[in-house]
Amino acid sequence: MSTSDSLFAGSIPEVYDRYLVPLIFEVPARDLVRRLMRDEPKHVLETAAGTGVLTRELALQLPASTRIVATDLNQAMLDHAATRLTSPDRITWLAADALALPFEDHSFDAVACQFGAMFFPDKSRGYREARRVLRPGGTFVFNVWDRITENEFANVVTQALATVFPDDPPTFLARKPHGYYDAAEIRQHLTVAGFASIDADTLTAISTAPSARDVAMAYCQGTPLRTEIEARDRSRLEDATQRSADALARKFGSGAIEGRIQAHVITASR
């Protein structure tokens, strides 16, 4: 995996949280928490926490006595996440690699990961670590995006950028966030990691945004797609963003727009 594929630094965390989180992450976060609440966990680990959208939902919905440890590979994302919570006492923030978790065996009742597994360079190793830190009977709940053609905004942005850089189209969105969607492959990785009880559902929702420009900002400047654009021509970031916005407006209209998002939600028990 290219280092830039998992690097959320510089201005990316702020733009990500401002534009991308409300666009595509809030509904799936609430869905994950609903699934976790069924088992009433007392100690929850979150991996790949990003700017804390799932963390905030966990803190809001789970009992005050539930302890939450939120980890991410990128310290910049955690730093931004910590500024968004007004009652941080129950949450521990820790920069940690999901493939090498710094916790003892059987430390948590539940492990949650929102849209992070796609970035694991070794999927089974990441799942094996989640299983290792789970107590017997514990639950690992995570989601991954479906293929890019089932996620309309991301698909239009990717197509638009191919016209900006026809000789070397940026492929980050199709390759990473939307590149790990095969249910059989996911199940195989979990089985190799030692999970035996595995369930998978598909979550479909409608994403809304105040404008096409907001969506273009979310993807072009709030994800590592920005790094791909700038690697091709740093001076064309604004042009690439605007070309994406124009393509979105042509397809979805002016003013507020909406488009389909789709993800797979997986529950695996230890």
Question: Where are the predicted features?
Answer:
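Short SAM/SAH-binding signature in class I
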Residues: L45, S107-F115, A263
